[in-house]
Swiss-Prot record:
Protein name: Cytochrome b
UniProtKB keywords: Electron transport, Heme, Iron, Membrane, Metal-binding, Mitochondrion, Mitochondrion inner membrane, Respiratory chain, Transmembrane, Transmembrane helix, Transport, Ubiquinone
Source species: Colius leucocephalus
UniProt-annotated binding residues for heme b b562: H84, H183
Cofactor: heme b
């Protein structure tokens, strides 16, 4: 009998083992769809980004008008730009759901997969930040100035570090050029790390909502989950196209319709919505270095998840106290996001500080305590 090419060809064999004959737990829910959605987001962003880069000029005098030119004069340039800008928002929606799912169902116990995932999140955040600077509007310029300035909080080498990042004594042409270079490079790096992420995942196999070993009961990925993923794609592409076609500027900042002007500071400098929770944590500490450390810790704390897992059960499915804490953490993140979008004045300052303390307290103190308590209650 002739060998099955899908299973014998060196390249097709890899595809087959990852996407077709991959043994998958039969009970994984829709929360497991976000990984494939992130893959689609990455492909969409790379494709639309390449088309935008073909018409973009990385020069302070031309960047703003080159983006306007793309939207006005290039065939479907407006659509490509709107899909790219809003695609970033969907990328973050998917990654936050994906992380939340991993946190809820104890997927962080696959340490290598989890750690590469956190590195992917950091890379995505860096990519989105440098990308936001490229249209060279007011918020692009001042966002770049404020965030890169944070490096000056590093003791001893801070100022040198900032000037090295800027390529001069302020955010200017060299900064824009290198940010464009980084924005072009990073998505391909993300694609590479994604392959490492998947390699580690396929070493152990997927987790499932019950958090139990499912080796004795698995089904092939295709056609069951390939079809389920296609449903996920449609359900994501629908709101993305709706947003890009009906209200493309809904999530953007009106300040970015004004070309960058180093002499005029916008009344309220704030990042895109997906960074607001971290921005609120940064602002809630009056000390510059302290704020920078808290900002870094707000994301790097994810690396500690496997170490803080004290429960004898993997998932939160049968742990109502942990579930309550999880949803409190979610609500707290929404509060931080809202506070980050508000001006720095009386009620918002104290709300931000309380929400920041609560954020770290829930993750670092309350979760391990509740997990230990649940073990005692279940007589483990």
């Amino acid at each position: 009998m002739a060998p099955n090419l899908r299973k014998s060809h060196p390249l097709l064999k890899m595809v087959n083992n990852s996407l077709i004959d991959l043994p998958t737990p039969p009970n994984i829910s829709a929360w497991w769809n976000f990984g494939s959605l992130l893959g689609i987001c990455l492909l969409t962003q790379i494709l639309t980004g390449l088309l935008l880069a073909a018409h973009y000029t990385a020069d302070t005098t031309l960047a703003f008008s080159s983006v306007a030119h793309t939207c006005r004069n290039v065939q479907y340039g407006w659509l490509i730009r709107n899909l790219h800008a809003n695609g970033a928002s969907f990328f973050f929606i998917c990654i936050y759901f994906h992380i939340g799912r991993g946190f809820y169902y104890g997927s962080y116990l696959y340490k290598e997969t989890w750690n590469t995932g956190v590195i992917l999140l950091l890379s995505l955040m860096a990519t989105a930040f440098v990308g936001y600077v490229l249209p060279w509007g007011q918020m692009s310029f001042w966002g770049a100035t404020v965030i890169t300035n944070l490096f000056s909080a590093v003791p001893y080498i801070g100022q040198t570090l900032v000037e090295w990042a800027w390529g001069g004594f302020s955010v200017d042409n060299p900064t824009l050029t290198r940010f464009f270079t980084l924005h072009f490079l990073l998505p391909f790096m993300i694609a590479g790390i994604t392959l490492i992420h998947l390699t580690f995942l396929h070493e152990s196999g997927s987790n499932n909502p019950l958090g139990i070993v499912s080796n004795c009961d698995k089904i092939p990925f295709h056609p069951y989950f390939s079809l389920k993923d296609i449903l996920g794609f449609t359900l994501m592409i629908l709101p993305l196209t709706t947003l890009a076609l009906f209200s493309p500027n809904l999530l953007g900042d009106p300040e970015n319709f004004t070309p960058a002007n180093p002499l005029v500071t916008p009344p309220h400098i704030k990042p895109e919505w997906y960074f607001l929770f971290a921005y609120a944590i940064l602002r809630s500490i009056p000390n510059k270095l302290g704020g920078v450390l808290a900002l870094a810790a707000s994301v790097l704390v994810l690396f500690l998840c496997p170490l803080l897992h004290k429960s004898k059960q993997r998932t939160m499915t049968f742990r109502p106290l942990s579930q309550l804490l999880f949803w409190l953490l979610t609500a707290n993140l929404f509060i931080l996001t809202w506070v980050g979008s508000q001006p720095v004045e009386h009620p918002f300052i104290i709300i931000g500080q309380l929400a920041s303390i609560t954020y770290f307290m829930i993750i670092l103190i309350l979760f391990p305590l509740i997990r230990t308590l649940e073990n005692k209650m279940l007589k483990y």
